[in-house]
Amino acid sequence: VYRFENGVRRENGRLCWNIDALAAEVVNGLKAAHDAGYTPATIGIDTWAVDFVLLDAEGQRIGDAVAYRDERTEGVREALERDYGLTFAEHYARTGIQYQKFNTVYQLMALKQEHPDQLAAAKMFLMVPDYLNYLLCGVAANEYTNASTTALVGADSKDWDDALIAMLGLPRDIFQSIKTAGTVLG
């Protein structure tokens, strides 16, 4: 019913998604479906994994939606081992996520180094599809399959690994409850 262009662009020295345009295009797509005579009973949002946004106490976005293709995560894996004693073998055993330099944990640690003020101001962490859901229905939640790509979710518990999050000095309270795919949000 509806298609639109999407890509990353350089903002504030980083490769970023135009998240506001993406959100607007989702709404335009829903309007196009309605205009074509379709009335969806439900909406599911599927995007690339690993990318996220932070929101403040008023639900406003903090900073840019930096894309996984950005170079900010260079060397972060090595820094986790050097500075936190977190070997890749231990990390993998906890989360079951293979090493990809763009996994969310490395993005968060790069953000912690570059913009600690953003993490300090954050009240919510939402993966990109979770953020789009939040804009549509006002419910903040982290969907499990996408959250698992953060390398911060326990492979056994299928929930946030609180000890790992604390070890890395990330604010635990920003992570929303994890919901399974297909959970009705609003």
Give a label for each model feature.
Residues 91-186:
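Gly/Ser/Thr-rich active-site cleft segment
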Residues 38, 86, 169-170:
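Helix N-cap/coil-helix junction residues
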Residues 70:
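Carbohydrate-associated surface elements
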Residues 73, 86, 97-101:
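Gly/Ser-rich phosphate-binding catalytic loop and adjacent alpha/beta segment
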Residues 10-13, 75-79, 152-154:
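Short, charged, surface-exposed secondary-structure boundary motifs
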